[in-house]
Amino acid sequence: MKVIKLEDLLGTEREVDDGNWVSRRFIMKDDNMGYSVNDTIIRAGTETHIWYQNHLETVYCIEGDGEIETLSDNKVYQLEPGVLYALDKNDEHMLRGGSKDMRMVCVFNPPLSGREVHDENGVYPADLD
């Protein structure tokens, strides 16, 4: 069994800061669970282009506010605590932080190795290992 405290991830290689967001990576590929779990803060007032061509992601908002826009149809969905979205079609999207930082629990399949950052197209590489 694994028990992981957020405070133990802070300032380690499992905390990745991209400027618009900071991701604390609880479960990663090397944990051999078949998925990864991140606690991610989307900073207020930011906009991030994301297109997970190699991963499926489910995201649950637990704090703050913002919005997600799917670029294939320009639909905008408001995000607030209690809202979950699933990028089940590798949806290209814009993620926007609202008036305050937004905290999200993110699950990826296949799992992240932990070193991923978005490329110029908003994509994580298929596998860094």
From Swiss-Prot:
Q: Does the keyword DNA-binding apply?
A: no
Q: Which reaction does it catalyse?
A: (2S)-4-acetamido-2-aminobutanoate = L-ectoine + H2O
**Would I find Thylakoid among this entry's keywords?**
no
A GO molecular function assigned to this protein is: ectoine synthase activity
Family of the protein in this entry: Belongs to the ectoine synthase family.
List the NCBIfam families. Answer: PRK13290.1
Name the PANTHER family on file: L-ECTOINE SYNTHASE, PTHR39289
What this protein is called in its record is L-ectoine synthase
